């Protein structure tokens, strides 16, 4: 039996949170800092020394020896440089532990050593990290010691954003301002601030670490590049919500405890659809905290797995033939007075503010579907989206029967008179309670689904930061809110104007609503008839960043400059090309050094067996050995030819000038060549004696953990 955990006692114990600040900061300093955190007012630099001292004292008391400016560069993972608290020794050789206000507020790093898309040249190395006081500092405790992590933004010497956090904070300010205007239009003048709230559901795989270390593809790329399906996959539907095995449960227990100590509100855990696949979901938080905490979740998942002899796979498609992993981004808008803008109430047809918000979101998603699709573009997601396991690459909105009925009433007659209800769930069993059903069902095939009081963006990849998706969501909805507020604030008759605006937006953007099965070919054809984009792969989605539409959208709200968008497009092309090249080279390495030599050894055994049987008994039937030897040899020849083709494709693609051209060449030429190499290898795995196969099979990986 494991020891009981007092969650309330340990929650946030490693976080410099509001409780700690209130205890340790002078009252006037605390009030000024709290004002900045809660209301978004400008940070007063004069309080930095007092905050730094209190933060250092708390950290040292908890065993910390170092601090770091913890930031999120455009690599998609976090970065940190550790400095000790030690100051210069005095004449007696003793040292004092220091953290100055300047060291808290500003750090410096090499801006050219991170992806910058040309914003930083090698000789222009200076980059700055700036303290984000809206996200609490925390202690990272592991085998390396205890480190005070100070969340920061990361920018170039000229102020260009080189990270994920800065644009997110900009977008939050943008939607805050415009959403407050919407509230005020409806007389809710007490609202002073609106914050996007996010709850990212994190899917992941766990495999045995010893087996993981035997596969170069998992080590180098995070996914398997070869592998035949075992006799059983996920077809029995017995893993989803199944009993959590003890080894996995012990991992989840330790993971939860680590996260709770770091103030991450880990809430739900369960087995997912694929064997060895699981999910962790947190409680909703402010968007910037949710983004930071999701990075902490992914890092902690890997650390805890390693300690327990496991490996955590966050790749979108670690195993071909079973479901991949995503990260559902649940998004809503909450006022400082406790109102959720996406709550339709019991009678949505009478909730005019909600209908306006809904119409604006429909407009935003329809007009900027390309940007929303691009925000979920990472190389691994190409293998997941539209594969009967995840939403299609076509952006559409699911609103459910109740809301769709209200929309239909407004579009057809100009007014809505009623809202459908869910009714009672009647089980027919006396001892089971009857209860009210939700007003609508769920649709797991939709990329952007309304689920009662929030929207769930389901396209985000499991390894990806949720920052970019929320940057796009916040900004495109801010634009729609602004245009609506501009029109309504100038109206002579508000009631008539808002009614006409809602109807107009619903009619103009009705095409984005789809409540059907997004997995079918019929939807692909229907979407084309509606004029909806189908950006099937990452490289096709990247150009959406550098359109005049995107420049104007992000520029108007100060979220990205034109230069920042162009840099991000270049970084995306480069990331895709590098990812594909690493995978291709890994396949070449595994095929040339492991699979082909193993198959040759096996064919020698077959040939020797054939010769021995013929010599011992000439009349014996050796057709099985002969057929197996011929089939194995033919596949070996096919594999060697495919290997040579892949090697040649890598060379020709590397010669392409420009990252855009190189990325497209990788998708058009290298990816198909990789598939051509994998096909004979996977067939050989089904023929070759397991004792000769050079690495663990799918069955070994996903069923033996």
Predicted regions located by residue number:
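Basic/polar N-terminal segments that are highly enriched at the extreme N-terminus
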Residues: 1-9, 704-705
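Active-site core of metal-dependent hydrolases
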Residues: 10-124
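Conserved active-site and cofactor/substrate-binding residues in soluble primary-metabolism enzymes
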Residues: 20, 24-31, 50-54, 62, ...
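Active-site proximal loops enriched in glycine and acidic residues that flank catalytic Cys/His/Asp
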Residues: 47, 71, 100, 282, ...
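Hydrophobic/aromatic-rich, well-ordered segments within soluble, folded domains that form packed cores
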Residues: 64, 68-72, 291-307, 333, ...
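Short, intrinsically disordered, low-complexity segments enriched in Ser/Thr and Pro
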Residues: 88-122, 237, 360-362, 484-493, ...
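Glycine-rich, acidic/polar active-site loops that bind/position phosphate-bearing ligands
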Residues: 125-314, 323-326, 333-570
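C-terminal amphipathic alpha-helical interaction region
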Residues: 502, 507-705
